[in-house]
Amino acid sequence: RDNTTCDGPCGIRFRQNRXXXXRIIGGQDAAHGSWPWMVSLQIFTYHNNRRYHVCGGSLL
């Protein structure tokens, strides 16, 4: 099986069961640089000089 393909329809997000939404409970903050393949897409707002996390992913 080709690992570069996805089983779902292109351009349509998968439905999630809201009752079984994933959460991290009792986790710990990671040191900067300890997970170099992880990315965080953030939006910077000038009016309050803050960044907001939008989504994340991993570099393959």
Swiss-Prot record:
GO biological process, one term: proteolysis
MF terms in GO: amidase activity; D-mannose binding; fucose binding; serine-type endopeptidase activity; serine-type peptidase activity
Regulation of activity: Inhibited by SERPINA5.
Keywords: Disulfide bond, Glycoprotein, Hydrolase, Protease, Serine protease, Zymogen
Annotated glycosylation sites: 3
Any GO CC annotation of this UniProt entry: acrosomal vesicle
EC number: 3.4.21.10
Segments forming domain Peptidase S1: 24-60
Enzyme class (EC, first level): hydrolase
Catalyzed reaction equations: Preferential cleavage: Arg-|-Xaa, Lys-|-Xaa
Similarity comment text for this entry: Belongs to the peptidase S1 family.
Note: X's in position 19 to 22 were introduced by homology with the pig sequence.
Reported function: Acrosin is the major protease of mammalian spermatozoa. It is a serine protease of trypsin-like cleavage specificity, it is synthesized in a zymogen form, proacrosin and stored in the acrosome.
Protein name per the record: Acrosin
Origin species: Capra hircus
Lineage: Eukaryota, Metazoa, Chordata, Craniata, Vertebrata
